[in-house]
């Protein structure tokens, strides 16, 4: 490290530019499309700067996670400060506040939101990121506990943090802004009623969005035994390598088929994504079962079950890949209403 103040500031500046490049590319394309070269070009520094400042690309990613969490913590503090300015709120204010906070995070905290999601995906492949996930979880547990306390919903912070885990991801996907925001409000209204021990209906905006999603469901190429085998392989590649790794060659290798066979049955990259979507959706939806079953658990037991489910459910990680890709890539807009509004057992477990 250099001694003079000017040189020290230059080093810090280039390191921060690299961190900013990581955050920008997490939001625009995801880790699977990133490289040391692309980050160095965006930051305007030589590739060697990554290794000079951070020692490795992985350590740069970890530094970017720490930076993102610091910004997320400031976002939380700002929201709580605004709440403190008006004093305690009644439980009736809770659903509107919950929807407003999720919406603000997805819009104004968008880069940090993508960083958090990339951390979750990275932990499935790199155990070192598991510690980072726990640091994120601690931020949200504290924040939602404080929000619930201010709305006379004390004791529901852990459960609401889990709802936020789910809905903040779905709300990153932009379909019809007005409908998306209204549907989010419907869900938060239902959540508040559920916490009060009441039945939670779907809500008019959410029901309308779900109906449209079902009506416009794309035709999906999973027809016969061979097509199903290809779709299973596509879902496995998606889970392991991300959307960038979802190629005809990778799927052929995963399915133990020739490239020619896969290319004949699934002709385009878009068809390959559709095949993976079909298999992941069927797995997560549980064969179409949508009616929620009664949950006979204490709140603490339910939190434990849901956290374990998030950590261990491989199909959900593949779905997360699709959700994040749809949030970034306009070419996947044909799947957006289905990804946002057609859900299976995962949501039924909560509502």
Positions of the model-derived regions?
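Hydrophobic/aromatic-rich alpha-helical bundle segments in the mid-to-C-terminal region
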Residues: 7, 130, 134, 147-208, ...
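Short, structured motif recognition centered on aromatic/hydrophobic residues
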Residues: 34, 72, 112-122, 133, ...
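Amphipathic alpha-helical packing segments from all-alpha helical-bundle domains
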Residues: 108-117, 124-150, 312-320, 330-351
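Helix-turn-helix
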Residues: 27-63, 237-271, 275
